[in-house]
A protein has these predicted regions:
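N-terminal secretory targeting modules
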Residues: 1-38, 191, 257-286
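Conserved SGNH/GDSL esterase-like catalytic core that processes O-acyl groups on lipids
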Residues: 6-8, 16-106, 112, 118, ...
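Short loop/turn hinge sites at secondary-structure boundaries
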Residues: 53-60, 182, 250-255
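Alpha-helical cap/lid subdomain in secreted, periplasmic
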Residues: 73-235, 256
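Extended, basic/helix-rich recognition subdomains
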Residues: 218-276
Length: 286
Protein backbone atom coordinates (compact mmCIF):
# COMPACT_ATOMS: atom_id res chain seq x y z
CA UNK A 1 0.00 0.00 0.00
CA UNK A 2 1.05 3.58 -0.51
CA UNK A 3 1.31 4.57 -4.17
CA UNK A 4 -0.02 6.88 -6.86
CA UNK A 5 -1.74 5.44 -9.92
CA UNK A 6 -3.18 6.87 -13.12
CA UNK A 7 -6.00 4.65 -14.35
CA UNK A 8 -8.03 4.87 -17.57
CA UNK A 9 -11.14 2.72 -17.94
CA UNK A 10 -12.23 2.06 -21.52
CA UNK A 11 -15.77 0.90 -21.04
CA UNK A 12 -19.39 1.83 -20.59
CA UNK A 13 -21.86 2.45 -17.77
CA UNK A 14 -20.51 -0.58 -15.89
CA UNK A 15 -17.23 1.31 -15.51
CA UNK A 16 -18.78 4.77 -15.07
CA UNK A 17 -20.28 3.58 -11.77
CA UNK A 18 -16.75 3.55 -10.34
CA UNK A 19 -16.80 7.33 -10.12
CA UNK A 20 -19.41 7.26 -7.35
CA UNK A 21 -17.26 5.98 -4.48
CA UNK A 22 -13.88 4.71 -5.69
CA UNK A 23 -12.17 8.14 -5.51
CA UNK A 24 -13.33 8.71 -1.92
CA UNK A 25 -12.39 5.19 -0.88
CA UNK A 26 -8.87 5.75 -2.22
CA UNK A 27 -8.62 9.11 -0.44
CA UNK A 28 -9.30 7.28 2.82
CA UNK A 29 -6.32 4.95 2.27
CA UNK A 30 -3.01 6.13 3.73
CA UNK A 31 -0.54 7.44 1.14
CA UNK A 32 -2.65 6.34 -1.84
CA UNK A 33 -3.49 8.59 -4.78
CA UNK A 34 -5.64 7.88 -7.83
CA UNK A 35 -6.11 9.79 -11.04
CA UNK A 36 -9.18 8.16 -12.57
CA UNK A 37 -10.51 8.73 -16.07
CA UNK A 38 -13.34 6.85 -17.74
CA UNK A 39 -13.88 6.66 -21.51
CA UNK A 40 -17.61 6.08 -21.51
CA UNK A 41 -20.30 5.26 -24.05
CA UNK A 42 -23.47 3.67 -22.70
CA UNK A 43 -23.73 -0.01 -23.62
CA UNK A 44 -20.49 0.13 -25.60
CA UNK A 45 -19.19 -3.25 -26.71
CA UNK A 46 -15.62 -4.08 -27.67
CA UNK A 47 -16.72 -4.06 -31.29
CA UNK A 48 -18.19 -0.58 -31.00
CA UNK A 49 -15.03 0.78 -29.36
CA UNK A 50 -13.16 -0.20 -32.51
CA UNK A 51 -15.83 1.26 -34.79
CA UNK A 52 -15.80 4.58 -32.94
CA UNK A 53 -12.00 4.66 -32.95
CA UNK A 54 -11.91 4.19 -36.72
CA UNK A 55 -14.56 6.88 -37.23
CA UNK A 56 -12.59 9.34 -35.10
CA UNK A 57 -9.46 8.48 -37.05
CA UNK A 58 -11.23 9.57 -40.22
CA UNK A 59 -12.95 12.53 -38.55
CA UNK A 60 -11.11 14.05 -35.56
CA UNK A 61 -14.25 16.02 -34.68
CA UNK A 62 -16.03 12.74 -33.92
CA UNK A 63 -16.05 12.60 -30.11
CA UNK A 64 -18.60 9.96 -29.10
CA UNK A 65 -17.30 9.37 -25.57
CA UNK A 66 -17.82 11.35 -22.41
CA UNK A 67 -15.24 11.53 -19.66
CA UNK A 68 -15.61 11.40 -15.90
CA UNK A 69 -16.73 15.05 -15.95
CA UNK A 70 -19.22 14.43 -18.81
CA UNK A 71 -17.11 16.20 -21.44
CA UNK A 72 -16.99 14.84 -25.02
CA UNK A 73 -13.83 13.16 -26.27
CA UNK A 74 -12.53 10.53 -28.67
CA UNK A 75 -10.71 7.40 -27.59
CA UNK A 76 -7.59 8.80 -29.23
CA UNK A 77 -7.78 11.83 -26.95
CA UNK A 78 -8.24 9.70 -23.85
CA UNK A 79 -5.23 7.57 -24.67
CA UNK A 80 -3.04 10.65 -25.19
CA UNK A 81 -4.21 12.58 -22.13
CA UNK A 82 -1.65 11.06 -19.82
CA UNK A 83 0.96 8.39 -19.39
CA UNK A 84 -1.45 5.85 -17.92
CA UNK A 85 -0.26 3.24 -15.45
CA UNK A 86 -3.28 0.98 -15.91
CA UNK A 87 -5.91 0.78 -18.66
CA UNK A 88 -8.92 -1.47 -18.20
CA UNK A 89 -11.18 -3.00 -20.82
CA UNK A 90 -14.47 -4.89 -20.54
CA UNK A 91 -17.27 -6.24 -22.68
CA UNK A 92 -20.74 -4.71 -22.82
CA UNK A 93 -23.00 -6.48 -20.35
CA UNK A 94 -25.62 -7.54 -22.90
CA UNK A 95 -23.06 -9.65 -24.76
CA UNK A 96 -20.62 -10.37 -21.93
CA UNK A 97 -21.99 -13.90 -21.63
CA UNK A 98 -21.32 -14.66 -25.32
CA UNK A 99 -17.63 -15.60 -25.85
CA UNK A 100 -17.86 -15.17 -29.63
CA UNK A 101 -18.46 -11.41 -29.22
CA UNK A 102 -15.03 -10.72 -27.68
CA UNK A 103 -12.77 -11.31 -30.65
CA UNK A 104 -11.32 -10.00 -32.89
CA UNK A 105 -12.35 -6.74 -31.22
CA UNK A 106 -10.46 -7.25 -27.96
CA UNK A 107 -7.25 -7.93 -29.86
CA UNK A 108 -7.73 -4.79 -31.96
CA UNK A 109 -8.36 -2.66 -28.87
CA UNK A 110 -5.37 -4.13 -27.06
CA UNK A 111 -3.17 -3.35 -30.06
CA UNK A 112 -4.37 0.28 -30.09
CA UNK A 113 -3.67 0.64 -26.38
CA UNK A 114 -0.21 -0.89 -26.66
CA UNK A 115 0.70 1.38 -29.57
CA UNK A 116 -0.18 4.52 -27.63
CA UNK A 117 0.60 3.45 -24.06
CA UNK A 118 3.24 0.70 -24.15
CA UNK A 119 4.05 1.35 -20.49
CA UNK A 120 0.50 0.68 -19.27
CA UNK A 121 -0.69 -2.57 -17.75
CA UNK A 122 -3.89 -3.64 -19.47
CA UNK A 123 -6.40 -5.28 -17.15
CA UNK A 124 -9.96 -6.56 -17.43
CA UNK A 125 -12.96 -5.60 -15.36
CA UNK A 126 -15.22 -8.62 -14.98
CA UNK A 127 -18.80 -7.35 -15.13
CA UNK A 128 -21.84 -8.86 -13.39
CA UNK A 129 -25.09 -10.64 -14.12
CA UNK A 130 -28.35 -8.72 -13.89
CA UNK A 131 -30.95 -8.58 -11.16
CA UNK A 132 -33.15 -11.67 -11.49
CA UNK A 133 -36.15 -9.44 -12.23
CA UNK A 134 -34.75 -8.74 -15.71
CA UNK A 135 -37.08 -10.43 -18.18
CA UNK A 136 -34.16 -11.78 -20.23
CA UNK A 137 -32.85 -13.89 -17.33
CA UNK A 138 -35.80 -14.20 -14.94
CA UNK A 139 -35.91 -17.92 -15.73
CA UNK A 140 -33.81 -20.22 -17.89
CA UNK A 141 -36.73 -20.27 -20.33
CA UNK A 142 -36.50 -16.55 -21.08
CA UNK A 143 -34.96 -14.73 -24.06
CA UNK A 144 -31.34 -15.60 -23.34
CA UNK A 145 -31.99 -19.14 -22.11
CA UNK A 146 -30.19 -18.30 -18.85
CA UNK A 147 -31.10 -17.42 -15.31
CA UNK A 148 -29.03 -15.07 -13.15
CA UNK A 149 -26.55 -17.76 -12.11
CA UNK A 150 -26.30 -18.99 -15.69
CA UNK A 151 -25.51 -15.52 -16.99
CA UNK A 152 -22.73 -15.16 -14.43
CA UNK A 153 -21.33 -18.59 -15.23
CA UNK A 154 -21.12 -17.75 -18.93
CA UNK A 155 -19.63 -14.28 -18.54
CA UNK A 156 -17.18 -15.57 -15.95
CA UNK A 157 -15.95 -18.19 -18.41
CA UNK A 158 -15.71 -15.65 -21.23
CA UNK A 159 -13.68 -13.17 -19.20
CA UNK A 160 -11.45 -15.91 -17.85
CA UNK A 161 -10.74 -17.12 -21.39
CA UNK A 162 -9.84 -13.58 -22.48
CA UNK A 163 -7.56 -13.10 -19.47
CA UNK A 164 -5.78 -16.39 -20.10
CA UNK A 165 -5.24 -15.56 -23.77
CA UNK A 166 -3.45 -12.29 -23.00
CA UNK A 167 -2.15 -13.05 -19.48
CA UNK A 168 -4.13 -10.12 -18.05
CA UNK A 169 -5.15 -9.59 -14.45
CA UNK A 170 -8.86 -9.33 -13.71
CA UNK A 171 -10.80 -7.04 -11.38
CA UNK A 172 -13.48 -9.51 -10.14
CA UNK A 173 -16.37 -7.08 -9.69
CA UNK A 174 -18.83 -9.61 -11.09
CA UNK A 175 -17.71 -12.31 -8.68
CA UNK A 176 -18.09 -9.89 -5.76
CA UNK A 177 -21.67 -9.14 -6.81
CA UNK A 178 -22.37 -12.85 -7.13
CA UNK A 179 -20.97 -13.55 -3.66
CA UNK A 180 -23.39 -11.05 -2.12
CA UNK A 181 -26.22 -13.17 -3.51
CA UNK A 182 -25.37 -16.23 -1.44
CA UNK A 183 -27.86 -15.34 1.26
CA UNK A 184 -30.63 -14.87 -1.33
CA UNK A 185 -31.33 -11.13 -1.11
CA UNK A 186 -34.68 -9.94 -2.41
CA UNK A 187 -34.70 -9.72 -6.18
CA UNK A 188 -37.09 -7.62 -8.19
CA UNK A 189 -40.16 -9.48 -9.42
CA UNK A 190 -40.36 -10.28 -13.11
CA UNK A 191 -40.33 -6.81 -14.64
CA UNK A 192 -42.55 -7.46 -17.62
CA UNK A 193 -44.91 -4.94 -19.22
CA UNK A 194 -47.92 -6.34 -17.38
CA UNK A 195 -46.34 -5.59 -14.01
CA UNK A 196 -44.90 -2.23 -15.01
CA UNK A 197 -48.20 -0.94 -16.37
CA UNK A 198 -49.90 -1.89 -13.11
CA UNK A 199 -47.53 0.27 -11.07
CA UNK A 200 -48.29 3.92 -10.47
CA UNK A 201 -45.99 6.30 -8.61
CA UNK A 202 -45.94 6.92 -5.61
CA UNK A 203 -47.67 3.66 -4.69
CA UNK A 204 -45.30 1.14 -3.05
CA UNK A 205 -42.92 -0.21 -5.66
CA UNK A 206 -41.06 -3.52 -5.63
CA UNK A 207 -37.73 -3.32 -3.82
CA UNK A 208 -34.52 -5.30 -4.03
CA UNK A 209 -31.62 -6.03 -1.71
CA UNK A 210 -29.43 -7.08 -4.62
CA UNK A 211 -26.35 -5.06 -5.57
CA UNK A 212 -27.81 -4.64 -9.07
CA UNK A 213 -31.13 -2.98 -9.79
CA UNK A 214 -31.38 0.60 -8.74
CA UNK A 215 -34.23 2.89 -9.74
CA UNK A 216 -37.55 3.48 -11.39
CA UNK A 217 -38.43 5.80 -14.25
CA UNK A 218 -41.95 7.19 -14.52
CA UNK A 219 -44.05 9.21 -16.92
CA UNK A 220 -44.15 12.73 -15.47
CA UNK A 221 -47.82 13.23 -16.40
CA UNK A 222 -49.50 9.94 -15.55
CA UNK A 223 -47.08 8.62 -12.95
CA UNK A 224 -47.09 5.27 -14.75
CA UNK A 225 -43.87 3.31 -14.51
CA UNK A 226 -42.02 3.29 -17.82
CA UNK A 227 -38.84 1.46 -16.94
CA UNK A 228 -37.13 -0.34 -14.10
CA UNK A 229 -33.33 -0.54 -14.07
CA UNK A 230 -32.48 -4.20 -13.56
CA UNK A 231 -28.88 -4.14 -14.77
CA UNK A 232 -26.86 -1.32 -13.21
CA UNK A 233 -25.46 -1.31 -9.72
CA UNK A 234 -27.42 0.60 -7.12
CA UNK A 235 -25.58 2.85 -4.68
CA UNK A 236 -24.65 -0.03 -2.39
CA UNK A 237 -23.46 -1.98 -5.41
CA UNK A 238 -21.34 0.97 -6.49
CA UNK A 239 -19.72 0.94 -3.06
CA UNK A 240 -19.01 -2.77 -3.48
CA UNK A 241 -17.44 -2.10 -6.88
CA UNK A 242 -15.32 0.68 -5.41
CA UNK A 243 -14.06 -1.61 -2.65
CA UNK A 244 -13.08 -4.29 -5.17
CA UNK A 245 -11.23 -1.81 -7.33
CA UNK A 246 -9.46 -0.14 -4.40
CA UNK A 247 -8.33 -3.49 -3.05
CA UNK A 248 -7.14 -4.58 -6.48
CA UNK A 249 -5.28 -1.38 -7.38
CA UNK A 250 -3.57 -0.70 -4.07
CA UNK A 251 -3.23 -4.24 -2.70
CA UNK A 252 -5.22 -3.47 0.44
CA UNK A 253 -7.78 -5.60 2.21
CA UNK A 254 -11.26 -4.25 1.44
CA UNK A 255 -12.25 -5.24 4.97
CA UNK A 256 -9.80 -2.60 6.22
CA UNK A 257 -11.56 0.20 4.31
CA UNK A 258 -12.97 2.73 6.77
CA UNK A 259 -14.77 5.04 4.34
CA UNK A 260 -18.55 4.70 4.57
CA UNK A 261 -20.67 7.05 2.44
CA UNK A 262 -23.04 9.29 4.36
CA UNK A 263 -25.84 8.49 1.90
CA UNK A 264 -25.66 4.73 2.61
CA UNK A 265 -27.07 4.23 6.13
CA UNK A 266 -27.08 0.41 6.27
CA UNK A 267 -23.76 -0.22 8.03
CA UNK A 268 -24.25 -3.97 8.16
CA UNK A 269 -24.72 -4.09 4.40
CA UNK A 270 -21.58 -2.01 3.86
CA UNK A 271 -19.60 -4.42 6.04
CA UNK A 272 -21.06 -7.38 4.16
CA UNK A 273 -20.02 -5.84 0.86
CA UNK A 274 -16.49 -5.16 2.06
CA UNK A 275 -16.24 -8.82 3.04
CA UNK A 276 -17.56 -9.88 -0.37
CA UNK A 277 -14.97 -7.67 -2.07
CA UNK A 278 -12.24 -9.24 0.05
CA UNK A 279 -13.45 -12.75 -0.73
CA UNK A 280 -13.66 -12.05 -4.46
CA UNK A 281 -10.09 -10.76 -4.58
CA UNK A 282 -8.82 -13.76 -2.62
CA UNK A 283 -10.76 -16.41 -4.53
CA UNK A 284 -10.60 -15.21 -8.12
CA UNK A 285 -8.07 -16.90 -10.33
CA UNK A 286 -7.62 -17.13 -14.07
Amino acid sequence: MGSALKVLMVGNSFSLSCRSYLPDIVKSLPDCELKLEIAYIGGCSLQRHIREYETSRQDPEHRPYTDIADRPASLQEFLKRDRWDIISIQQASHCSWQPATYEPWAEKLITIIRETNPQAEIIIQQTWSYNAGDIRINTAQDEWGLDQAGMFSCLNAAYRSLARKYAFRVVPAGLAVQLTRKDSPRQLPRMDEKLKTSLVYPAPLPETDDAAGRCWYKDSDSGKILCADTIHLNRYGEYLQGCVWAGFLFKVSPESITFEPADLPDKARLAKYRSAAEQALQEYSV
